[in-house]
């Protein structure tokens, strides 16, 4: 059996305000992997909900919706105030906020049926084992989400440096190479970040501040993925987890480290990883994890040819017994 996940990202409704993809036939839920809409200079969005209202279950969207914020939602705004505003917007619209949050499919859907759910005779053993206070059989799936951001270290000597490396175990030369690569990535990113005009604590939020946020998200994500779970794990991030997602139009340049992380060691901890940010689709398997992106991108840059509005990822799942949520 499978759970069917519709995936959309990088819709950039600030320049495509009339773009409204429809629900994918048979989808069990929708994942919005960031950069849905922003209020950067010249935005064409007329509402105050970052374009999320059109995906609201309260406004008629037929499935649960999971949302991980991107980077552009913060353009021309204060980071912390916007973070709170986005979360409140999701709560108002009935969209599940997934920034440094984990939710199971059982929590997300409750007792609702979904397209991939087996009939009772197909889960006889599970039904027989269920006690009177248990909820109906449900797929054992958890969604672990964060914007993730980037540490700008993807193009450094990552085969030597890792999250567990220490100064005593790593050569001074390797650390110097890492810093040089990071500085180049900072310069490439800051060219654009200065135009984005995101502020934090009264100052522009540039690459160094973004790295600080990325390290917080990485620590959270690593801990969350390492939490024992008897089921299928889906990671959802805006920034890519691996250089394997790099946009082939640009190759491996310092700017690539502003889009991709080198967190390949985390891939075995998930069965599916959904992301956005790069305006190039991805669908590959690494270390047993399928990595998928389905971004719309910018029409003016001819980036939309690979986008599929009704794209659905079918996730094979096993079924478990869950107690009724409190």
Language-model region placement:
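Beta-strand-turn-beta hairpins that frame and shape the catalytic cleft
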Residues: 1-6, 103-118, 134-144, 231-232, ...
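N-terminal active-site segment of His-dependent metallophosphoesterases
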Residues: 1-67, 74-81, 126, 207, ...
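Active-site environment of divalent metal-dependent phosphoester hydrolases
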Residues: 12-18, 37-42, 72-83, 103-107, ...
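A basic- and aromatic-enriched beta-loop-alpha substructure that forms the phosphate/nucleotide-
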Residues: 65-110, 138-160, 168
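Charged helix-capping and loop-helix junction motifs
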Residues: 46-53, 81-85, 251-261
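Active-site neighborhood of phospho(di)ester-bond hydrolases with catalytic His/Asp-centered motifs
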Residues: 7-9, 30-35, 66-71, 96-101, ...
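Binuclear metal-dependent phosphoesterase catalytic core
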Residues: 2, 124-130, 247, 253-271, ...
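Active-site-proximal loop/helix segment associated with metal-binding centers of metalloenzymes
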Residues: 115-118, 127, 141-234, 241-245, ...
